[in-house]
Amino acid sequence: MAAKNKNKNKKVSSPKTAGKKDLVSVITTFYNAQIFILNAVNSVMQQIHTDAFDIEYVIVDDKSPDNSRAILEKFLEKSPNENNIKVKLVEPEENLGCGGARKFGIENATGNYLMFLDADDYYIKRDFVKRAYEEIVNEQADIVEFGMIFNQPNGQQVNSCVQQKMIVEDTTMAEILLFKDNAIKFNVWTKIYRKDLCDKFEYSTERIFEDVRTIPVWVSLAKKIVIMPSCEVNYRAAGGSIIRDDVLKTRLGTISGIASLFERFKNDRRVLKAMYGRAMVDLTALLDGHSSNNPGFNQMNQLNTYMLKYIYPDSYQTVTYNVENDPTASPYREE
């Protein structure tokens, strides 16, 4: 069976060099994050570890123009590092954007496991990294997924996690859980990864929606994924984010990111259909309340056509958007 809802008690060895402790690298990138960055950094610096592994904290200053770095350096200088976290503050030669900065962080990480945390989010519990490490080692998994608490701007909180532990050892099922059921999230920061898995496909350097172009590929490369029924990351929907300010651009970016993966998964029709279903959720939401004169409307239809061609390559006819002055006319025509 592809997905199992039971625990396995088998203990296994991790992919470390004989005689050496494992190292978990946590990566945070920041840009104009002076308001929240200490919450994120402190939540990592408070993480406990064991004799089996150490924690390396790679913090990437993506040429932030505000006081984030000064605030961070003052905190690191005055705060006792009681847990002996190995802090590495690095800076690229130029601003790279979200995707490029994360890739830069990965390149500077020396751990054999990777975790990520955005500068405006934080880990809820002090033993999260420890439990994530133990889970990925004991299950001999490539990826372990955890849930999150989504803090909305209006103060409401939404918990997002599965009800019971799931073990997925089938690539197609994993992709369906990602695109259709949302049990596996597109975001990069609710997971722990084996570094050697991530090395097989470079993190996207896109400035936004880079995770949509990366996570599905990492999921497809994983032989075993574990999904845990616990919320471990506090996700803050903060105003001013380059992603959250424009819903239209956000959904278009998600759809475009999904479409960019169709070539990779073109030989698995079930995965393609799951991907298309996920994209259609965003398409439907975009169409609702937007007129056909919206600049993004034609782009949406072109993406829809592009995806359908992959799913039904032998039978699908080219469709283009065609609304004229008659509002009752069909918006589509066959060519």
Please tell me what each predicted stretch does.
Residues E232-A238, R244-K273, N293-P313:
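Catalytic core of nucleotide-sugar-dependent glycosyltransferases
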Residues S220, S260-E263, A285-D288:
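Short glycine/serine- and small hydrophobic-enriched flexible loop segments
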Residues A2, N9-I255, E334:
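Nucleotide-sugar donor-binding/catalytic module of glycosyltransferases
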Residues A274-L286:
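Amphipathic alpha-helical repeat scaffolds of TPR domains
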Residues V60, L283-S292:
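Active-site activation/catalytic loop segments of kinase-like enzymes and analogous catalytic loops
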Residues L76, P80, V137, D181-N182, ...:
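Generic secondary-structure transition motif, activating predominantly at the C-termini of alpha-helices
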Residues L261-G277, V323-E335:
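Long, charge-rich low-complexity segments
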Residues M1-K4, K8-A18, H290-E335:
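Membrane-interface aromatic/basic loop that binds lipid-linked glycans or pyrophosphate carriers
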